[in-house]
């Protein structure tokens, strides 16, 4: 057993790729609801003096042949959750607006990240979100139904992307 640990330690020191894989696996978590896969729900730590926050999914995927939509989310850490998108308007200004759902076409993948595209706005936080904290969130999909996920508060997310994949 001791030689196995020595081998693994040596492999980690020699291979940045192995180290990156192990680090990414440490952050990985998610849920599945029918054909919907929710990969790594996360939120960013609160900025000082703010009462709102944001949550994201490193990956939201519809593996099925039927379209679905995320239509609602709730969490005990905020008064309400709004589904939002960000886009540049005709004047070249980035604007955030509430939307009535996040569409998932068959076999679609959506990646969310701070400052780009879609996110879940946590309105009226009951206390600031601190790095490393976890909180529950219930997601409701138009077809697939409801699922409870755990959101992890992190400053940086390995492998996070933005927009539809």
Give the residues covered by each predicted segment:
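Absolute protein N-terminus
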Residues: 1, 28-29
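N-terminal secretory signal peptides that target proteins for export/translocation
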Residues: 1-11
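Bacterial N-terminal signal peptides
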Residues: 11-26
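Compact, glycine-rich, soluble single-domain proteins
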Residues: 30-165
């Amino acid at each position: 057993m001791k030689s196995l640990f020595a081998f693994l330690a040596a492999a980690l020191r020699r291979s940045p790729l192995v180290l990156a894989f192990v680090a990414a696996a440490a952050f990985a978590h998610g849920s599945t609801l029918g054909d919907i896969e929710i990969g790594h729900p996360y939120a960013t730590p609160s900025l000082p003096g703010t009462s709102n926050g944001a949550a994201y999914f490193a990956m939201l995927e519809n593996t099925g042949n039927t379209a679905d939509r995320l239509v609602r989310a709730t969490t005990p850490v905020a008064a309400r959750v709004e589904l939002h998108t960000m886009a540049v308007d005709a004047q070249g200004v980035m604007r955030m607006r509430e939307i009535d759902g996040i569409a998932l076409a068959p076999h679609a993948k959506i990646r969310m990240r701070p400052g780009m595209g879609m996110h879940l706005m946590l309105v009226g936080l009951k206390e600031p979100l601190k790095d490393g904290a976890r909180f529950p969130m219930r997601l409701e999909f138009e077809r697939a139904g409801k699922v409870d996920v755990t959101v992890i508060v992190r400053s940086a997310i390995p492998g996070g992307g933005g927009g539809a994949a």
